[in-house]
Amino acid sequence: MLAYWRNMGSKRNNIKRYGLIGRNISYSFSRGYFKQKFETENLENCTYENFDLNEIEELNKILTKKNIYGLNVTTPFKREVVPFLDRLSPTAEKMNAVNTIKFHEDGTVSGHNTDVYGFEKSLLEIISTLPKKALILGTGGASSAVAFVMKKLNIEFSYISRTA
């Protein structure tokens, strides 16, 4: 479990480290986005790093680093990270997929899936009448969140992708 590693961190300095875990993530805009966000919000003690992993087991190396407060999770580790966590939010548990990891003061680590919330909220803000059918473009990590929302809203859907 990640709680062991969280407790290994020192709170001597007040730098709060956040980051993204995934594979082949050099393309990700997350580091730049959060760097700008931290600057805008005058959060001088926060940093955001990309942690490019080949295998989920490499996560343990990251967790020995000091002052990790949260991680975003991307492909292909959204499902693979679940066994490493102490608890899951209800949505993450239903999906068996996590895109956000929170490190708590008590040393425990929780997993959340914000893809579902974000997609559902965005959809309901722009569409007043829900369709009966939908087409999901792609079968990547976020497509499972879109499908989850489609099922929840009773919208019939199909996938289309290069590999499906």
Q: What function would you assign to each model-found segment?
A:
Residues F157-A164:
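Anionic-ligand binding region
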Residues G22, N113-V116, L123, K132-K151, ...:
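Glycine-rich adenosine-cofactor-binding loop
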Residues S10-I127:
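Phosphate/diphosphate ligand-binding glycine-rich loop within oxidoreductases
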Residues Y48, A134, F157:
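Hydrophobic anchor at the start of a short beta-strand
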